[in-house]
Each structure stands twice: as structure tokens, then as C-alpha cells.
Curated annotation (Swiss-Prot):
Transmembrane segments: none annotated. Belongs to the EF-Ts family. SUPFAM superfamilies: Elongation factor Ts (EF-Ts), dimerisation domain (SSF54713), UBA-like (SSF46934). Residues 79-82 are annotated as: Involved in Mg(2+) ion dislocation from EF-Tu. The keyword Protein biosynthesis applies. This is Elongation factor Ts. Keywords: Cytoplasm, Elongation factor, Protein biosynthesis. Associates with the EF-Tu.GDP complex and induces the exchange of GDP to GTP. It remains bound to the aminoacyl-tRNA.EF-Tu.GTP complex up to the GTP hydrolysis stage on the ribosome. It comes from Bartonella tribocorum (strain CIP 105476 / IBS 506). The gene is tsf. Pfam families: EF_TS. GO terms for molecular function: translation elongation factor activity.
Length: 307
């Protein structure tokens, strides 16, 4: 029998399955909608590998901290609906927990045991793809530690404890009051969430990025027709402004724009009761760098039926 676009659309809405799966199910069951739903359900985990080709750009950032260590993980899903699912949220939280006992990179976390299970993180996520019905990607993971001090954390737009769309870790080295250091660290983490600095210090900025900016500023300055010595000063001024915008310690502190982050850190040493130093930070924003697929639903249905 021939399968209509209306049937494919209805089955997709009932099952949440993909277009081609819905078309195959209807063909196998002679258009019986209930039987087609059952046919898809029986596929179960077997659908997981097929889903692995679909773009997963939604999902959640998870953060877990313990003592002087903290981790960020990003697990993507195809839709925000699944990201709000309790089961998906548990997976993100547990993967972050597992990451604490590893070096923190995706490879080491993936082969570690999933909390409360004899399966690895990688296998648990693959099983969940079939159960939840969407492609899921363990995209990235990072760990930040400090020998003496604290690692402050911040989740922006939190949907649950330790879960949200943007996460930040900040390591502060100090022998002073940890609660005061954590409080200031959280403020810095919020600042980083808002400003997205490229590096901690000017020396840490990628050399290629610096040269690229310098070349752009030089070309712009030469268009003014001014002498070369004036152009050099113009470029120096613009590069100074560039570093003020992208270097964490040089940025105007969001909580008090009258001082830089470095000056705010010096001021915070009064409440911390000892010298303090920011030794590193990590910022994950959900889906950054992932190109989301924009699908014409009507065209997708038509293509599936014709295909």
C-alpha cells in the first residue's frame, strides 16, 4: 500500500520517531497506526545507532564539585523537551559525578563506570538513546583542581541543582578563609558567564588571535593616512583596549565596573584573610559551535513519503 504524508505526520506525533522510521513502520503494518506504533516500540535500542547521525544541539551543562575539584560536562540532545526530562537530567548529573574520579576529559570519563552501574558511561548513554528516543552526545568534559584553595562553580539559568545552559568553574589558590574565597569565586564565575573572556592573562591569549587583531587594527589605522609613528600608537591603543575586553584579569568587574577583576581580587583578600590568585577558569555554553539543523517540516514529510 502507499503511505501518505498525513499518516507519516500522525505516526511521528504519536511516537516521536523519525520520518523514515515512521514510513517503514506504516509500510510494514499496512497503514495500521496502532500496529505501527508497536512496530517502532519493538525496535527499541536498535534505533540508537540510526539516531546517531542526527544533530544534537540542545541538552544540558552539568557541574559537580568536591573539595578542591570540580567538573563541567556537556551532554546534548536533539530537543529541549528531552533536556527537561528527569531521566536525561539524572544522566547528566551522574556523568559529571563520574568525571570527578577521572582526569576529566571525554575519553577517560566515557570508559569510567557509570555511578551505581557495572556499565561504562559510554554504554549507559547509548542505552539511553534507545530508551529516550533521541540522539544524545557526550560532547565535552573538563576538570579544574587546585592544590591549596577552592574551585567555585556557577550555573546560569539553572533548571535543576547543578544543571543549566551555561556553566563556569573558577580556581582560586589561597590558604585563607575558604568560604570567603568561594563567595568571591562565585562572583567571578558569574562575571565570566556574562563576559566570556578568552584567557586569564594577556600572555595566555592565543598568539594567532593577537596577530589577527593587530593586522586588522593596522589596516584600519593606515586608512587614516596618518604617519607611521602615529599609526603605531593607534594600534597600541586599540590592542590595549582589545586585551581589556578579552583578558579576565584586565576586564572591568561586572559586580563593580569601577575596578578590574584583578583589583577586585586584591580587594577580596581582605575578607579572605590571605593572598589569593585566580589560577584558571573554564566556561561551557550549551551548543556553542554546534550548527543546529533547521528543518522544513512539510518538506521533510514529502521527502520521506517520496523516498
Amino acid at each position: 500500500m502507499s503511505v501518505t504524508a498525513a499518516q507519516v505526520k500522525e505516526l511521528r506525533e504519536l511516537s516521536g520517531a523519525g520520518m523514515m522510521d515512521c514510513k517503514a513502520a506504516l509500510a510494514e503494518t499496512n497503514g495500521d497506526m496502532d500496529a505501527a506504533v508497536d512496530w517502532l516500540r519493538k525496535k527499541g535500542i536498535a534505533k540508537a545507532d540510526k539516531k546517531a547521525g542526527r544533530t544534537a544541539a540542545e541538552g544540558l551543562i552539568g557541574v559537580v564539585s568536591k573539595d578542591s575539584h570540580a567538573v563541567l560536562v556537556e551532554i546534548n540532545s536533539e530537543t529541549d523537551f528531552v533536556a527537561r526530562n528527569d531521566g536525561f537530567q539524572d544522566i547528566v548529573r551522574n556523568v559529571a559525578t563520574a568525571a570527578l574520579d577521572t582526569p576529566g576529559d571525554v575519553e577517560s570519563v566515557s570508559v569510567s563506570l557509570y555511578p551505581g552501574s557495572e556499565k561504562t558511561v559510554e554504554l549507559t548513554i547509548k542505552d539511553a538513546i534507545g530508551t529516550i528516543g533521541e540522539n544524545m552526545t557526550f560532547r565535552r568534559s573538563a576538570k579544574l583542581s587546585v592544590e591549596n584553595g577552592v574551585v567555585a562553580t556557577y550555573i546560569h539559568n539553572s533548571v535543576s541543582d547543578g544543571l543549566g545552559k551555561l556553566g563556569v568553574l573558577v580556581a582560586i589558590e589561597t590558604t585563607g578563609n575558604k568560604e570567603a574565597a568561594l563567595a568571591f569565586g562565585r562572583q567571578v564565575a558569574m562575571h565570566i558567564a556574562a563576559t566570556n573572556p578568552l584567557a586569564l592573562t594577556a600572555q595566555d591569549v592565543d598568539a594567532g588571535a593577537v596577530e589577527r587583531e593587530k593586522a586588522i587594527f593596522s589596516d584600519q589605522a593606515r586608512q587614516s593616512g596618518k604617519p607611521e609613528n602615529i599609526i603605531e600608537k593607534m594600534v597600541e591603543g586599540r590592542m590595549r583596549k582589545f586585551f581589556e575586553e578579552v583578558v579576565l584579569l584586565s576586564q572591568a568587574f561586572v559586580m563593580n565596573p569601577d575596578m578590574t577583576v584583578e583589583a577586585a581580587l586584591k580587594d577580596a583578600e581582605k575578607s579572605i584573610g590571605a593572598p589569593a590568585k585566580i589560577t584558571g577558569f573554564i566556561r561551557f555554553a550549551l551548543g556553542e559551535g554546534v550548527e543546529k539543523e533547521e528543518t522544513d517540516f512539510a518538506a521533510e514529510v514529502a521527502a520521506a513519503v517520496k523516498g
